[in-house]
Amino acid sequence: MSTLSKVALGMMGRLRPKPAIGHSDSSIKLPSPDTHGGIPLMEALSQRRSLREFARNELPLPVLSNLLWAAYGRNRPDGGRTAPSALNAQEVDIFVALPAGAYLYDASEHELHLVVASDLRRVTGYQDFVDDAPLDLVYVADYTRCSLVAVESREAYAFVCAGAITQNVYLFAASSGLATVIRAWIDRAAIADAMGLAPDQQVLLSQTVAYPKVTT
């Protein structure tokens, strides 16, 4: 669907997900992440970039596992994560939009839990490339976890946490030969409606991840 069509449907409150493609498993157990290897940090930083042309090939499960762990997985026995959050609130959740459905990443169990058995990729971004890329990450703040943070500061703190997560994804993509782009121009109301979010949850950002499109 074109960008203009999405914007028009969004203005009318009619931007809706498509039916799921394939079987929607209620949960997906991810393989243990490979936390060793990769390219040196300085090299990953030199290769970090935003790309907007994606192959349609789905990411193998081990790659998805490593990606989500790098983004915001648990890296310490005490439950610490790979990205910081103010007062360790860990208020940002990662929703994974796949052709078969939208899933919530559970870092404690390192698995995905089905949220809605629909293809949300049309909804998760205005850009036309989002529809066909195999994976979109949606970052959502859950402010019920922010009781120690002043109300007027919660949104800013959540965006800082989400920004750190997106940079982790960028660096993993650079290290793994993937393409990614972070997007703030999204229909937050349509995404929240499609995922059935509660009033205390706020859609922050969306990030497409895929193999880069090969041009001939």
Regions found by a protein language model. Name each.
Residues 99-100, 142, 212:
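Solvent-exposed coil/turn segments that connect beta secondary-structure elements
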Residues 1-133:
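N-terminal amphipathic, basic helical "cap/leader" segment at the start of enzyme domains
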